[in-house]
Amino acid sequence: MNNTIINSLIGGDDSIKRSNVFAVDSQIPTLYMPQYISLSGVMTNNGPDNQTIASFEIRDQYITALNHLVLSLELPEVKGMGRFGYVPYVGYKCINHVSVSSCNGVIWEIEGEELYNNCINNTIALKHSGYSSELNDISIGLTPNDTIKEPSTVYVYIKTPFDVEDTFSSLKLSDSKITVTVTFNPVSDIVIRDSSFDFETFNKEFVYVPELSFIGYMVKNVQIKPSFIEKPRRVIGQINQPTATVTEVHAATSLSVYTKPYYGNTDNKFISYPGYSQDEKDYIDAYVSRLLDDLVIVSDGPPTGYPESAEIVEVPEDGIVSIQDADVYVKIDNVPDNMSVYLHTNLLMFGTRKNSFIYNISKKFSAITGTYSDATKRTVFAHISHSINIIDTSIPVSLWTSQRNVYNGDNRSAESKAKDLFINDPFIKGIDFKNKTDIISRLEVRFGNDVLYSENGPISRIYNELLTKSNNGTRTLTFNFTPKIFFRPTTITANVSRGKDKLSVRVVYSTMDVNHPIYYVQKQLVVVCNDLYKVSYDQGVSITKIMGDNN
């Protein structure tokens, strides 16, 4: 060994007390044995809107503690005609609400969307929850007996505070009956389909078939001690209002803010959807592909099947078509002599005043080349130059035809309109499918009357992405970085006498062009506050809301 290294060790001061870094004293743990346990639930339709509810009762004299809940859901075979697919992560999106209760009341509960948000950085959990090409790609049935989707089972990891440190954080039963209750979303929230698919029949025949699994621990001579858990509480603001308030905030570990689109019952139809492939490019490619069949037409005369307001022109010899202040180059090879190439110059249009700015999707294409196939009667496109973005793909069809639009907005063919898709994904955030457009330009949080935090940039969103390793567009203020389980979490603490017992959030929405249809997508502000509770096991399992530093 090198002399310098040897001398650096020999010359060390032996009088200093040092910790052993080459060995540790092993401790004998509590005697326990874990087991995977599964059970069926009792199904009812007692939800707020006749939603399906599954209740799972856990009471076994040999189960001392439990954690790591997994919900199994069977998806049926889908047969019939039309286009159909399940939303990505369909298992999570089936869930509206989860609660864990004892005879003393609710111990912990969470909304389905917040459960999904908590698991968004767990790729394995997301994969098993129903993220596959078989489930999520849009499949087509051509006859009533066609199988559109094979039956499948998805597995939803229900992440709870009892999973943080395995045995330490597990929920101790304390000879109590524990009930896990899952409220499900309507079936319309979890499927993507076109108007030709018989959704009414599918909805009537669809039955949620869940099974709950968990890790149960049999423990010998268990010594149960009180612990702390964080319980999320969600407040949804009024439509298009920039404020939301969480009341009765006494000890909070974090506060999260995001926006959601509100489409209503008639605004959830869209032109395209990519299915399993969920990158921004996939959304844009799917949208462009849908538009091209209506945009460039090879025909032996003026194209038919379009509304009277459609402005379709024949492409001249030089291939250049002028649309207002823009030029589009079109070159289609192998066109038969008796046919011509046409360009649709007002495919989708929007404007709030005549003779002012017009948002025209046709103008967003600058060059289109391809080859016409006489055998298939279709054009194979080779090169498309365009400026279509994720916002364009996220515009509901209804906005093109809304009363705010002074133009005949949707000039597509009847055949194309029939392929539009109903998308009612309950967990979409922001105003576009990928939540890329940051529509909050300023955020202010008040605790009582005092300004707790304000920002003119997205720094709270950046920190949330860095700390959680997820990209869900949520802005989060975290008040607790204390290691879990072994310490009481740090909280922002109320002072009721001074009015400090509510968190008020106000945002300033980003400026958008009123002539862009996306401006009219309604939105809601969502605020999620994590309250701190103490779990006690004196007489069964019960929780107490922390009211200050001394609890």
Curated annotation (Swiss-Prot):
Keyword Membrane carried by entry: yes
Sorted UniProt keywords: Membrane
Induction, as annotated: Expressed in the early phase of the viral replicative cycle.
GO process annotations (BP): response to antibiotic
Pfam families: Pox_Rif
Domain of life where this protein originates: Viruses
Location, primary (coarse class): membrane
Extra information: Displays structure similarities to capsid proteins.
Protein name listed in UniProt: Scaffold protein OPG125
Species, as recorded: Variola virus (isolate Human/India/Ind3/1967)
Gene this chain is encoded by: OPG125
